[in-house]
Amino acid sequence: MSLVAESNSGTISEQELDKVQLYSDLCLYEEALTKLVDSVDNFKPQLEIGKQLIEADKKLYSTLDLLPQYDSVFTRLRTLDDEISKVDQQTKNILSILNECHDDLNALPLLEEVEFEKKMILKQREKIKSNVLLEYATKLAKFTKIPPTFDKGTIGPNNFIWPAEDALRKGMLAMASLHGKELTKLPGQEDGEEDGSTANEDKNIVKDAEGAEGEIRQDDKKEDDSFVFGANANDAEGDEDKNAGEDEDEAMDSDLDLFNPDEF
């Protein structure tokens, strides 16, 4: 094996190097030079070997013109090697991320399990727990705990959380007073008819009120007149009482007749 082949044996294979023209010319020049040196050492120099060495030298010299091209190819090869290493590193990172994502997806539950758990949660929400219900009742009630003076045997409406019947009746009466027109409205009656009927009712009420006031005034006048008449009558009765008293005195004096017709 030649020295050139030994120097490049660790990096590139010999078959690949044989395809390069410069490498093959160097090998031929080395072989011809080695044969010439061996013949000189043996004191048997051969002219043919010298001619072969000259031909190899000429061929190698013509091949050296391609050296810049080989250098550019080598530089491009190094650049590609660097890119390949970077791409390999990126590929390794992507594969590691994909592996982590695969593990995370495997750790997640299945869709059927999620739907089953969701149904179970909804069923549990439909059921009201007793402690939650009691806590809500204590918020609505007047007392959060039983008072010390409370008698458990007596249950009255004052301790209920809902209002008593009297409060409900008052509330219904208040709502009826606020919505009286809507409650008294006939089913087929329109708003205009209702307004006209209410206006007529108001007029009738005003007329009735005026008539009642007139009657009250007449009654007042009669009372005034009767009061005056009654006052005169009282005066007359007072005079009659005086005359009757005198007559009684005379009767007692004369014949003791106690009958007084004015008393009946």
From Swiss-Prot:
Instruction: Please give the chief subcellular localization of this protein.
Output: nucleus
Where does this protein have compositionally biased stretches of type Basic and acidic residues? 200-225
One GO cellular component from the entry?
core mediator complex
Task: Please tell me whether the keyword Transcription regulation is annotated for this protein.
Answer: yes
Keywords linked to the UniProt accession? Activator, Nucleus, Transcription, Transcription regulation
A GO molecular function for this record? transcription coregulator activity
The record's Gene Ontology biological-process terms are: cellular response to heat; positive regulation of transcription elongation by RNA polymerase II; positive regulation of transcription initiation by RNA polymerase II; RNA polymerase II preinitiation complex assembly
Start-end of Acidic residues biased regions: 236-264
Q: Where is this region: Disordered?
A: 183-264
> Subunit info?
Component of the Mediator complex.
Give the UniProt family note.
Answer: Belongs to the Mediator complex subunit 4 family.
The role this protein plays is: Component of the Mediator complex, a coactivator involved in the regulated transcription of nearly all RNA polymerase II-dependent genes. Mediator functions as a bridge to convey information from gene-specific regulatory proteins to the basal RNA polymerase II transcription machinery. Mediator is recruited to promoters by direct interactions with regulatory proteins and serves as a scaffold for the assembly of a functional preinitiation complex with RNA polymerase II and the general transcription factors.
What name goes with this protein?
Answer: Mediator of RNA polymerase II transcription subunit 4
Q: Which species expresses this protein natively?
A: Candida glabrata (strain ATCC 2001 / BCRC 20586 / JCM 3761 / NBRC 0622 / NRRL Y-65 / CBS 138) (Yeast)
